[in-house]
Amino acid sequence: MNSEIELFKKNKKGSDKWVKLICGASNEDIVAIEDLSAIYSAAGVDYIDVAADESIVEAARNGIKWAKKLYGASPGLMISISDGKDIHFRKAKFDPLKCPSNCPRPCERICPTFAIDYSGVKENKCYGCGRCINSCPLNLISEYEYKLSNNDLPKTLQTIKPDAVEIHTEINRLDSFIQVANILKTSGIEFKKISVSCGLNQSQKGPKDLLKALWDRYEILVEHNVPLIWQLDGRPMSGDLAPSTGKDTVKLWNNIGSHLPPGLIQLAGGTNEKTHEFLKINNFPDGIAFGSSARKIMQPLIEDANKNNKKLYEYPEKMDLAIKKAQKLLNPWKIS
């Protein structure tokens, strides 16, 4: 396994880094996901991470096929799963009949995916960022869980056959992590990579506790003989899109990066176009994952195309613009 990791690193030329697009573990917007997958595949991402759902995976693969045909780009496909309750696996809801007629509707304005209108929350467009929950002056918005059960996971894996899987976990959830890891091991799927995503924001623990938790999970996964990725989730699902949000994951990297188990090390959680500026030039991790920031810059273009019942990649000029926007985000991590 370690030799495969080293081979991957050697094949990444110069300062080129591993980059992943996060479409959202509870994002069901298949129209946007197809366009996002096409855009970021063409721009040069290494993997695309989507919800564990057959229709969503099909949309992502369609986007990848488009990019492969025109650009020769074919990133791997990863699905996100969880070993327990997790804020990445949620959606928002409210009863629109309870909204006062004179409400300024801050929830609608703040939603990055345009998932809210007078009918409430469009379930397929909501990916659970939580921004609307905090914005409602009457506290009418709540959340509910959107998660694949362990009972359904084996069948889903066989149907989708993803290239990779990411397990979202928490420091104190080792037993449930073992259960999920065993399902992966007995699935019969030859995964190219297994990613473990964990951070501190959902616990009262410190960096040393996180480090121990990741080593515990390494001892479990090392038997799988699959290259591993350790995703340091600095600011998971905060809903905050400010440039400084990437500081939390960089802080985690600085604290424990050199002591992590063997595998690729990836930053996530609040990452954006400014994150690389918070890193020391001679101390970059193996890669980065972009979620909300990557989707936000494309959403207006995708929505505009969708108004005409078309995909963005059916408009060559607009697609060229989208790819350039994506490349600008990726360039600090990829060879320009």
Stretches found by the model and what they are:
Residues 40, 60, 165:
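Conserved, mostly hydrophobic/aromatic
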Residues 16-32, 82-101, 124, 140-150:
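Active-site mouth loops of central-metabolism enzymes
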Residues 104-122, 131-148:
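Iron-sulfur cluster-binding cysteine motifs and their immediate structural context
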Residues 41, 100, 108, 112, ...:
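Non-catalytic positions within long, well-ordered alpha-helices that form the structural scaffold/packing
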Residues 46-114:
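A broadly conserved sequence feature marking short terminus-proximal activation segments
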Residues 7, 54-85, 135, 181-195, ...:
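Alpha-helix-loop-beta-strand connector modules within alpha/beta enzyme cores
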Residues 23-28, 32-34, 45-46, 52, ...:
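Conserved mixed alpha/beta catalytic, RNA-binding, or beta-rich assembly cores of soluble enzyme
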Residues 1-24:
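N-terminal amphipathic alpha-helix/helix-capping segment at the start of soluble metabolic enzymes
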